[in-house]
UniProtKB/Swiss-Prot annotation:
Cofactor(s), names only, from the UniProt record: Mn(2+)
Record key words, sorted: Hydrolase, Manganese, Metal-binding
Family: Belongs to the arginase family. Agmatinase subfamily.
Subunit relationships: Homohexamer.
Source organism per UniProt: Pseudomonas aeruginosa (strain ATCC 15692 / DSM 22644 / CIP 104116 / JCM 14847 / LMG 12228 / 1C / PRS 101 / PAO1)
The protein's name in its UniProt record: Guanidinobutyrase
Length: 319
């Protein structure tokens, strides 16, 4: 292990309930020189003015960090040792405009231009799903069009919401229109519930996306599916966007638009672990809404899924 790599603060150095609540109790880094030294970073985007039902995900980054205090460095299931090979830190939150959604989107894109300019691979704590659009805009400038693994209860391909083109339910329609995605390398997993028409998921299919509805995932391991996903999206840079409402509300009630019949926490880990070997260039975990998360379990799940994302990044060694 490189002694110069940042390490999470251990439970014997500071009690788990003490200290500053950064993600995994990692150092908080902001200076240009420190940013240049990072390989990956956790960054919060506390935006929820793009939501259509229950707000509150502006508090998601803070609570995910608070629930991350029990996460330890080594992944005992997969052998991943991310802190042995990558320099990782928490670089704080994007200072969004909470009164103007379009201005907030502009600010997010600008901030991710800066983050990517330091050579950092971003692991984003949302925030509602609107935030993925400006992140993808910034990523295209660096990596070109990307493949996408998108876990969600909803396709987020509405043309508009109340006449607005930018909202958490329009993100991937805009991403296609702006040529941000390599549409033949996109998979959406966990889509479910009711639609306005019988063809609501077909727009995605017509673009070349593979759509895996939640019912196709019931009562089974998703390891075989993820082998197919790797075949579909591999061969170039890939972004992973994980909406917590992809998980059944029995496990993740703290979200803005819950839908029954969703994925399990085990399936969520299978999906993320199944991304190992892909050329991941960024990840996000969105739509955790702490006001509806009375036990903290949704934030705890979000924190652990972000750790699992860290564990499958390119360059992570296994012990």
């Amino acid at each position: 292990m490189d002694k110069n790599l940042h390490q999470p603060l251990g439970g014997n150095e500071m009690p788990r309930f003490g200290g500053i609540a950064t993600m995994m109790r990692l150092p908080h880094v902001q200076s240009p020189a420190e940013l240049d030294a990072l390989d990956a970073a956790f960054v919060g985007v506390p935006l929820d003015i793009g939501t259509s039902l229950r707000s509150g995900t502006r508090f998601g980054p803070r609570e995910i960090r608070a629930e991350s205090v029990m996460i330890r460095p080594y992944n005992m299931a997969t052998g991943a040792a991310p802190f042995d090979s990558l320099n990782v830190a928490d670089i704080g939150d994007v200072a969004i405009n909470t009164f103007n959604l379009l201005e907030a989107v502009r600010i997010i894109e600008q901030e991710y231009d800066r983050i990517l300019g330091h050579g950092i691979l971003p692991l984003t704590l949302g925030g509602d799903h609107t935030i993925t659009l400006p992140i993808l805009r910034a990523i295209k400038k660096k990596h070109g069009k990307v493949g996408l693994v998108h876990v969600d209860a909803h396709a987020d391909v509405n043309d508009h919401m109340f006449g607005e083109k930018i909202a958490h339910g329009t993100t991937f329609r805009r991403a296609v229109e702006e040529d941000l995605l390599d549409c033949d390398r996109v998979v959406q997993i966990g889509l479910r519930a009711q639609g306005y028409t019988a063809e609501d998921f077909n727009w995605s299919r017509k673009q070349g996306f593979r759509v895996v509805q939640a019912e196709e995932c019931w009562h089974k391991s998703l390891e075989p599916l993820m082998a197919e996903v790797r075949e579909k999206v591999g061969g170039g840079p890939v972004y992973l966007s994980f909406d917590i409402d992809g998980i059944d509300p029995a496990w993740a009630p703290g979200t803005g638009t819950p839908e029954i019949g969703g994925l399990t926490t085990i399936q969520a880990m299978e999906i993320i672990r199944g991304c190992q070997g892909l050329d991941l260039i960024g990840c996000d975990l969105v739509e955790v809404s702490p006001p509806y998360d009375t036990t903290g379990n949704t934030s705890l799940l979000g924190a652990n899924l972000l750790y699992e994302m860290l564990c499958v990044l390119p360059g992570v060694v296994r012990r």
